[in-house]
């Protein structure tokens, strides 16, 4: 067990803070909840603290919760491939570019680390080149979320990982908005981290609303499990 992994043996409180600017529409979001890496479970509630969110909530899910991939459940035979926990408590910087097909892009930079007993994800998001009447700024996405696989590989030069995946957002007219994600994670501290063999995270997310919440918000339940490296096949993945 890495030193960082020891911090995730029970339920851990999570705080998420995001400052965003999409096509000049500025906004802030604050999220709170908890994670349980034993089950790969996240329960979070996000509130737009600046009024109405200028983009659809589902477009921010990967920035919020795929940002705290340290809560992914890694099976025993894969624990030596868990970069995310091994970088704790100092944490990691997570940088991402998200390309929305036939529309604009988000660039995000997050610092994910422990502050006391709380796992904090602080994010800056900049969005450019979005069409004002497109699926994103035109709010044409359904309020739901599909399951996805997130592909991880080691980046030995930067002592971190590279991650890529494609998200399918459901549109109200029955079509799909694709979003390509390119992600880089590098440790903040200078201690040893685990550099993984290629594998993936399987994610299931459910969005809901709090009937008692008057502010613009999103409630998220998510399960994340690492997979792709099987027992006794280590040689194939070297």
Curated annotation (Swiss-Prot):
The keyword Magnesium does not apply. Contains a chromophore consisting of modified amino acid residues. The chromophore is formed by autocatalytic backbone condensation between Ser-65 and Gly-67, and oxidation of Tyr-66 to didehydrotyrosine. Maturation of the chromophore requires nothing other than molecular oxygen. Photocytes. Changing residue 46 to L: In mut3.3; shifts fluorescence lifetime from 3.03 to 1.88 ns. In R10-3; matures to the red-emitting state with excitation and emission maxima at 555 and 585 nm, respectively. Changing residue 167 to V: In P9; increases fluorescence at 475 nm excitation. In R10-3; matures to the red-emitting state with excitation and emission maxima at 555 and 585 nm, respectively. Green fluorescent protein has been engineered to produce a vast number of variously colored mutants, fusion proteins, and biosensors. Green fluorescent protein can be mutated to emit at different wavelengths such as blue for BFP (when Tyr-66 is replaced by His), cyan for CFP (when Tyr-66 is replaced by Trp), and yellow for YFP (when Thr-203 is replaced by Tyr). Further generation of mutants led to more stable proteins (at 37 degrees Celsius for example) with brighter fluorescence and longer fluorescence lifetimes. Changing residue 145 to H: In mut1.3; shifts fluorescence lifetime from 3.03 to 2.78 ns. In mut1.5; shifts fluorescence lifetime from 3.03 to 2.72 ns. In mut1.27; shifts fluorescence lifetime from 3.03 to 2.85 ns. Changing residue 99 to S: In alphaGFP/cycle 3 GFP; improves folding at 37 degrees Celsius, reduces aggregation at high concentrations, and increases the diffusibility of the protein inside cells. It comes from the Eukaryota. Keywords: Chromophore, Luminescence, Photoprotein. Changing residue 69 to H: In P4; leads to no detectable fluorescence. In mut2.2; shifts fluorescence lifetime from 3.03 to 1.94 ns. In mut3.3; shifts fluorescence lifetime from 3.03 to 1.88 ns. The modification (Z)-2,3-didehydrotyrosine is found at residue 66. The keyword Cytoplasm does not apply. Changing residue 69 to L: In RSGFP4; increases fluorescence and shifts the major exitation peak to 489-490 nm. Energy-transfer acceptor. Its role is to transduce the blue chemiluminescence of the protein aequorin into green fluorescent light by energy transfer. Fluoresces in vivo upon receiving energy from the Ca(2+)-activated photoprotein aequorin. Belongs to the GFP family. Monomer. This is Green fluorescent protein. It comes from Aequorea victoria. The lineage of its organism: Eukaryota, Metazoa, Cnidaria, Hydrozoa, Hydroidolina.
């Amino acid at each position: 067990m890495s030193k960082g992994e020891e911090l995730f043996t029970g339920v851990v409180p999570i705080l998420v803070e995001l400052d965003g600017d999409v096509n000049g529409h500025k906004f802030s979001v604050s999220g709170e909840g908890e994670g349980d890496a034993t089950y790969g479970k996240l329960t979070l509630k996000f509130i737009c603290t600046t009024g109405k969110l200028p983009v659809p909530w589902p477009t921010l899910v990967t920035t919020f919760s795929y940002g705290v991939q340290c809560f992914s459940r890694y099976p025993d035979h894969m624990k030596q491939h868990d970069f995310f926990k091994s970088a704790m408590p100092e944490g990691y910087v997570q940088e991402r570019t998200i390309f929305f097909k036939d529309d604009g892009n988000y660039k995000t930079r997050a610092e994910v680390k422990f502050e006391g007993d709380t796992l904090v994800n602080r994010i800056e998001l900049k969005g450019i080149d979005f069409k004002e009447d497109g699926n994103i700024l035109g709010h044409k996405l359904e309020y739901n979320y599909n399951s996805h696989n997130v592909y991880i590989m080691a980046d030995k030069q930067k002592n971190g990982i590279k991650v890529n995946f494609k998200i399918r957002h459901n549109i109200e007219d029955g079509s799909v908005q694709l979003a390509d994600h390119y992600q880089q994670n590098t440790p903040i501290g200078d201690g040893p981290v685990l550099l993984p063999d290629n594998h993936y995270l399987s994610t299931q997310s459910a969005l809901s609303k709090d009937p008692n919440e008057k502010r613009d918000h999103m409630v998220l339940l998510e399960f994340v499990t690492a997979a792709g490296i099987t027992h006794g096949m280590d040689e194939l993945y070297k």
